[in-house]
Amino acid sequence: MSGHSGHDVKYGRHRTRRSFARISEVLELPNLIEIQTASYQWFLDEGLREMFRDISPIEDFAGNLSLEFIDYDLGEPKYSVEESKNRDANYAAPLRVKLRLINKETGEVKDQEVFMGDFPLMTEMGTFIINGAERVIVSQLVRSPGVYFNGKLDKNGKKGFGSTVIPNRGAWLEYETDAKDVVHVRIDRTRKLPVTVLLRALGFGSDQEIIDLIGDNDYLRNTLEKDNTDNAEKALLEIYERLRPGEPPTVDNARSLLVSRFFDPKRYDLASVGRYKINKKLHLKNRLFNQTLAETLVDPETGEIIASKGDILDRRNLDQIIPNLENGVGFRTLRPTDGVMEDSVLVQSIKIYAPNDDEKEINIIGNAYIEENVKHITPSDIISSISYFFNLLHGVGDTDDIDHLGNRRLRSVGELLQNQFRIGLSRMERVVRERMSIQDMTTITPQQLINIRPVVASIKEFFGSSQLSQFMDQTNPLGELTHKRRLSALGPGGLTRERAGYEVRDVHYSHYGRMCPIETPEGPNIGLINSLSSFAKVNKFGFIETPYRRVDPETNRVTDKIDYLTADEEDNYVVAQANSKLDEQGTFTEEEVMARFRSENLAVEKERIDYMDVSPKQVVSVATACIPFLENDDSNRALMGANMQRQAVPLMHPEAPFVGTGMEHVSAKDSGAAVTAKHDGIVEHVEAREIWVRRVSLVDGKEVTGGIDKYTLRKFVRSNQGTCYNQRPNVAEGDRVVKGEILGNGPSMDSGELALGRNVLVAFMTWDGYNYEDAIIMSERLVKDDVYTSIHIEEFESEARDTKLGPEEMTRDIPNVGEDALRDLDERGIIRVGAEVKDNDLLVGKVTPKGVTELTAEERLLHAIFGEKAREVRDTSLRVPHGGGGIVLDVKIFTREAGDELPPGVNQLVRVYIVQKRKIHEGDKMAGRHGNKGVISRILPEEDMPFMPDGTPVDIMLNPLGVPSRMNIGQVLELHLGMAARALGIHVATPVFDGANEEDVWSTVEEAGMARDAKTVLYDGRSGEAFDNRISVGVMYMIKLAHMVDDKLHARSTGPYSLVTQQPLGGKAQFGGQRFGEMEVWALEAYGAAYTLQEILTIKSDDVVGRVKTYEAIVKGESVPEPGVPESFKVLIKELQSLGMDVKMLSADEEEIEMRDMDDDDFTNQNDAFNIVQPENAATEKTE
């Protein structure tokens, strides 16, 4: 090992890397898709049960019948994962629920098991299979339910406060101050009332009661003056008028309305997280910290004095009295009269002196520790939140920052599903109630009451069309993994792009170790869609936690005890960085340590440290942690680097990077694209499609062999993005494998590591200006040797339907098609597997009946003799679209007869898969891992590329001007280290924030026998002369991105037109034209190019008659006729006429031009070659 820095680390079975890490990892990375699998598991184990418990029992309006949910179980899924994909089905299991119907009059009890629909299951990879496609449910970041206080300035610059009590579902309660120092309340976003009205309605009727409760102060006096009610009943009526304007109020109605709005668990739900947050916020300790007591605290049981009047409660004193507070110090039982609640209310109240005036006493009230299982709001919550608001006005208590991750929580799959299921169940509940009152009570069974349609529909709607249920990004394993770890602030119940301001999107200090500050999309969603950090976990309340190493307070040593902290908890501690220097015992070597406290970065005495980071990469996400030398890149470019790695196309021959970060192995293993061993064992048999492993387990110290596990590998399957999904074995017969080890490489993997691109020889130099503006010049060797060749699989389908005129049929017998076009079709008219097809070739022959007139006797005779040919049919065959040519990989046929489930009206469905081998091409987009992207501008023959002194030509030339202004120097360090690694025949790992420094790079370069500045003389391949200066040449990892020129190239001569304006459609998918827009018209006007302009605006666009005649004229070789009136002009005139204006069109000699109607003969004649629109891409404009 001597002679170089770094040490060897083994990643998986086949790869060893020299790691430059200096910090040893204390904690293994967690399973990276746990956020999906754990949440779904919770839903199956507890979420479903919780929901049935909430809704059960359902009683009829009279209370005679009651339906209870007893138990449920999920059966076996109908199809396996593979089969669900092939059949376009859902991977789902039947949910059966055991119900009990109790007739209270007769005491009769009926039990029955009822089927409640098929419930989609999650695969082991954390995905769902819906209609045969893999989908991912993205976790949603929402505001946590709870009570929030925030400062606000009014228009005169006067400081005030606002406060909101936000439930999980139910009515909001908001408090605010106005310019006259009156405190108002809004119930459920209605008009505001003085806050004392709400207190009176709760049963504190007189002014004196309110003053005794809250404590005397100016704000309260102002509010009481503004309040024109003087007892509980008037207050109730006042509230009722606000909530139900226009209805005649009665006291009873008002009382029951308020009760149902806030104190009914079915209408108002805080969820356990809301109860937890409210108890935490309204606890007295936050407001007592550093305040002076204005009364003596006595233990109610023993009578001993805990703290005396005038004591200042610093942290130590406060910690001592907290247990006493929880035992009932300062508890007061209030007995409200005439209010909403009959019961007494328990609160906890303590008097302190105002911080700015030690004569004045303030009363602080807490909600007296309500049990976790009370999910609705209680009167004591309302009283304490009002008290907190008044305390804030006197400078006691804190306001909240809503962008802090302690106030934002995650709704993962399980909870999103639960909420959706609950909607379905509550719809079902209504139906059940109605049926209970209609049907005969004696004969009724649970089965007859239940209607599962709403439940099934709500689940289907969620998976099929929710904003959070997304088509999985399967471009490569990293894209797949990142998609499952994505956090979105959008979606139902979240933000919208337009409403989200700058603050929500910005990086917040509480994101540290929880959400990646780098990986987020560019564009309108920036900062709203984030990625989970590498070590983060989600706790039971949905808050993101990050691990820290605990520091022993006695010895000040860093222990290996790991605590997971939420953002709230972390706010109380001082946390040291992961790179702080420690000695063998785990003590800090320096007296002052760099540490974080809330949003500050400070140098702190080592005794004050509470925790220490686990790893330098705990800040960033998985994709960001795959960028070597991240610490040398500007963050904007790192963002592009992280995002572009997800768009890497899997290559035919992937190759792991020489310069990695050590994350390649973990991310490949956890992505779900690899085949991993489920048990320890010995490999018995390996072939391309299957691996057999004999299980081996230890029993009493002896090895015992068990059964065989068979692992099937997926070969050449189309991924969601049309890339090729292919798995290859990574083990040999006789290998011993352990549980979790990679048996087979997935796409973009090499030896069990992520391999998104290839290592190529790069020179930073210009070459005749061909790499201007980030363009890339490439050697032809990369094309010849298939270095950047990728495989793409496209799927085309054709269906035979029943039409009004008879069924369509698939056949070889197609009108007006020669035998040579049919040579690769079988007798059913379907292409054979292995055929090579070009644009516009037939894939599936299909004919559709035309409108059949009454046949004459002769026609019937012909029909009887010649069969199909004579019948009126039109050719609606499936043909290869432009740019879709390739080799037919597979054909799948689904028919009604064979028992396949097809949509209504479809008799037969044929899917054809065409595979293309795409070599790299001018116009393709490539990138490095540092956000250095570019388009290939020229592919030079090998002999023209500059070559090194030993004759090796370089592979790629990049423009050196792309580096300084972008400040992504990481690519230059990677280039040099990669060159040295290749020369030494090693792979290196340089983890983020803890990798090779400049000195390490130069010493490795010298070890490889290269010049210390790592530059070399290059010779011009054309002339053989040396270039004037030495040039940086090295090995860089370059990726081919999914933006390929073959997918973007598009040309049109004639094609479909929009129905209203008759202008050509736009976009490649619609086979549209190029829009010659307003500004382009100005350009031609500026040149006075009148004729060109005229034909662009008329016959090339929407002069319906003119374009047909022009087409004919061109075909027959005649001169082009005069253009007519454009259709869009007619549309304009019709619109003006529809507004009641009399608009006419006059010719030059002032004759009125008759506007011919839309259904002009020339235009409707469907037979002219020009206006035929294929029904598949019928002229409907797609709005993107």
Swiss-Prot record:
Species this chain originates from: Listeria innocua serovar 6a (strain ATCC BAA-680 / CLIP 11262)
GO biological process per UniProt: DNA-templated transcription
CDD domains in the record: RNA_pol_B_RPB2
EC number: 2.7.7.6
Record has Nucleotidyltransferase as a keyword: yes
Name the UniProt record assigns to this protein: DNA-directed RNA polymerase subunit beta
Quaternary structure note: The RNAP catalytic core consists of 2 alpha, 1 beta, 1 beta' and 1 omega subunit. When a sigma factor is associated with the core the holoenzyme is formed, which can initiate transcription.
Region (Disordered): 1160-1184
UniProt function note: DNA-dependent RNA polymerase catalyzes the transcription of DNA into RNA using the four ribonucleoside triphosphates as substrates.
